[in-house]
From Swiss-Prot:
One of its GO terms (biological process) is bis(molybdopterin guanine dinucleotide)molybdenum biosynthetic process. This is Molybdenum cofactor guanylyltransferase. NCBIfam families: molyb_mobA. It is found in: Cytoplasm. Its main location: cytoplasm.
Length: 191
């Protein structure tokens, strides 16, 4: 396989309720003096000319970190699957990196590893950590959009279950891999 990676879109999911954060918008919560979204943005910006953020509130604050914003088609924070569907609909490239807004330690090496794996297998790639899938660290071919839309129409709301309807390559990561840390509670922000 050639070293050159194909162009990809980046989709950052920031559309949740933030229940474990007391209802605060996780992407805009400060960590080390900056919003969590700023840390993720810094890691991914050099990798794509198409950075999409899925958010359902605070659009003005997120606009500074994205080329485009999308919201869920349904109200009331329907979950990450809805955000992925919305993002895939507008993505400009055939490959889409999916990340959460509350993973400030993600790095280029992890993203490029996922992208290489996806391209080599011509299928989705997702992190596996400690035997568990981590769908918020994945690369999807845009062509899975109809599969995800069908899953949604059939009542599926789990991003992981919807993605596993198709072939998925697993990128094994250690349980202690800090790059996969989700800062989704006030306690985690103390790390």
């Amino acid at each position: 396989m050639p070293d050159a990676l194909p162009p990809c879109s980046i989709l950052i999911l920031a559309g949740g309720r933030g229940q474990r954060m007391g209802g605060r918008d996780k992407g805009l919560v400060d960590w080390q003096g900056e919003p969590l979204i700023a840390h993720v943005h810094r890691a991914v910006r050099p990798l794509s000319d198409d950075l999409v953020i899925s958010c359902n509130r605070n659009q003005a604050a997120y606009q500074a970190y994205a080329d485009r914003l999308v919201g869920d088609a349904e109200a009331d924070f329907p979950g990450p699957l809805a955000g992925v569907i919305a993002g895939l609909r507008v993505a400009r490239h055939a490959w889409v990196v999916v990340l959460a807004c509350d993973a400030p330690l993600v790095d280029r090496e992890l993203i490029e590893g996922l992208l290489r794996l996806a391209v080599a297998g011509n299928s989705a790639a997702m992190v596996r950590q400690g035997g568990f899938w981590q769908p918020m660290f994945s690369v999807l071919p845009k062509r899975v959009l109809p599969v995800l839309e069908q899953a949604w129409a059939a009542g599926e709301r789990s991003l992981q279950k919807a993605l596993l309807r198709e072939a998925v390559q697993g990128l094994e990561c250690a349980e202690s891999d800090r790059r996969l840390s989700n800062f989704n509670s006030p306690e985690r922000l103390q790390d």
